[in-house]
């Protein structure tokens, strides 16, 4: 008799705990989480981005980083334009450098720099020509300057391009 009450009490407690545990996973979805307006898109082509800045070879850096980010997300297959469902076109609008820290002896000498790259993109359906998604994305990176300024600047631009590419990939594959 005492054992039955004890077991019933434990059963009730375990039932309540399991119900609470199951409710916490109600919004979780396994598998692909594409936005609803992009459900029919399975492959994307990414032509080289247009570069409106004066920074040479920036378009190849950002385009390659974007292709890599889309491939890593696994949502879309990257293919040639004639074989893809949509095309991701983009224009690099601005690249800005901002001093975050200076040396103690000379405020004009930069110690830490922030590089920002701004891109306007559009995802267009290859069959209908309809714009499926568009927007502006900004990628940032902060970096300490080394004695080799050119190398440090190039590495910081690569990291800013990677951040930008991750944001573009998240926007077209997850909707935010």
Residue positions per predicted region:
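A structural "domain/chain start" motif
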Residues: 2-3, 22-75, 80-83, 127, ...
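A generic short-segment signal for beta-strand/edge and adjacent turn/coil regions
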Residues: 12-15, 47, 55-62, 84-92, ...
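Sec-dependent bacterial lipoprotein signal peptides
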Residues: 1-25
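Surface-exposed short loop/turn segments
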Residues: 32, 73-77, 82-131, 140-151, ...
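Soluble non-cytosolic domains of exported or imported proteins
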Residues: 52-64, 110, 114, 150-163
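Short hydrophobic alpha-helix segments
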Residues: 135-137
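Generic marker of residues within folded, mature protein domains
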Residues: 5, 15, 36, 80, ...
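Short linear motifs in low-complexity, proline-biased tails and propeptides
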Residues: 17, 162-166
């Amino acid at each position: 008799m005492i054992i039955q009450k004890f077991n019933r009490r434990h059963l009730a407690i375990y039932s309540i705990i399991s119900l609470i545990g199951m409710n916490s996973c109600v919004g979780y979805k396994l598998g692909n989480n594409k936005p609803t307006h992009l459900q029919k898109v399975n492959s994307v082509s990414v032509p080289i981005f247009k570069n409106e800045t004066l920074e040479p070879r920036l378009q190849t850096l950002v385009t390659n980083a974007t292709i890599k980010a889309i491939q890593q997300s696994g949502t879309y297959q990257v293919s040639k334009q004639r074989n893809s469902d949509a095309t991701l076109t983009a224009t690099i609008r601005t690249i800005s450098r901002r001093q975050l820290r200076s040396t103690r002896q000379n405020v004009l000498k930069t110690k830490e720099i922030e590089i920002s790259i701004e891109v306007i993109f559009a995802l267009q359906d290859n069959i209908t020509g309809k714009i499926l998604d568009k927007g502006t994305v900004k990628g940032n990176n902060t970096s300490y300057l080394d004695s080799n300024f050119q190398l440090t600047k190039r590495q910081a631009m690569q990291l800013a391009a990677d951040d930008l590419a991750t944001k573009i990939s998240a926007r077209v594959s997850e909707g935010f």
